[in-house]
């Protein structure tokens, strides 16, 4: 790991850069301190800073008048080229954050020195069973411990001073394709954690563990299991009535992979659930039923996990419209009275405002244009008014938004002074959904049920549609309308921070970190980080001076499927950057990737039919990690594979020769002849790229 720290004569930095290393041990982070986190302006103790998840800081040294003087103080490389999505936590001048492969770091906020690092040694072959890169969205702090969920399903408690493991709990059945990429949530002496894996075929649930001992307190499932074995609760018994067929043999889905929040006053936990398995309702059963509680927002009692209420955003989901996007609590004046609400900008393109006590639908509206799956929401119930063209049984359709959504996991922020919610929005994303009528559950592969070999006319139509766009959106949740939109030249924007300085901070895929005026969206400052940014910034005090830190590192599903943004998105070496007023450090960005077009490393005689077949197989088996059309982001671009790699191609793909690097064996998925067809396709793509452009 490399560090770059600036020497500065600016007085505010001198104040920040003395004396911290010998500070007293931090004040205990207990339940009372978490409940009063809003008044603790110096620190960032939780994922969204406070239990309401506003990501609003009362700090204002950095404001619309002074932000032009904001500069880099230090950067710390983290030794990865994979995605970085974590929200850093800050307590008493120490940054606690997570990186690729669930690695945890404790970093001195003034010097960038790594106080300790903990690597949970996740088996690299596990990468195949992870939907969207080997990412982690952050840790939790409580009573002298740091908690992290790992990609292989463990929940680990570390000593905050040393990084030494205190306890570890297996939260999943490791024989099944579960994973954890989300952050833990602390509530009432418990650590709450969910999991991912619905694309492969698992049953979703959320678990509560005793923060001191690591023993499980309760577990609440989100979709019903095998009825012949009985139901764990009345909620599961009722949910089973909305399913048909033998859904439990595939797991059912509905995983809680993100977005757990807690209201201490109501003693309720809120979380969203993911898609059902398979994606398409006609493959899950007869195409009927709401399939509870997949693609829904749930509230459960914190003491026992019992269901309090639910609201389903995509009944009978057919489009991968998870409801796992960030949830945010607020008390808003609506209709002449104060309402306790919970809000979500959903994947499906609608912004929801619900009563968080009862789950009552208050309001909802589209926050992006071009939605085709639904014409609107029922004004009383909030149930979507599904478009006739959004479901055609087993026939292919084009629908907007795409499975990446109009908004995904990237955190949004709420500023109480403006009354606005700020979020990264994607406009005009489209997807071709082609259900595979021959699909059968296979525990060794993706089980979304999509026909990756579809070659019909809709494929050409999809390619002819206008490309999507990205924007930072300021949304009024009371009026359910946009206050302003700040367009940017890429589709993907990172998470958001807002402050009392009338500022909104956000990074984006092209590596730009920008500050906007919160009231009107005017861009006031920007910094080129050299690498795409997905994570949200945080802000805090070090000896009275305000700092801003952000994780920088491109990856996730868009690292592979960002075809509309090729040439704009910047993969690179992951790092954490820290800024302050008067910072003068410079950023050295090592070269990453290839600057010259690829050339085929070997000659392989293959017919056009074989190459075409290889392209279909590549799309089904390889594009998930190595990129659509054999054009990769942070992972190896196979068009540049060397002669040595091609000579070992079969050994790597079928023999698992690089399993320790995250490339598992595909021997149960493809034959030798199919591997050769994939190889021929990759070489063909390298040859196409090497050709001079036609005049």
What would you call each of these model-derived segments?
Residues 76-87, 117-140, 168-183, 221-259, ...:
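Extracytoplasmic beta-rich repeat domains
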Residues 108-111, 121, 159-162, 211-213, ...:
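Short loop/turn segments that connect beta-strands within beta-propeller blades
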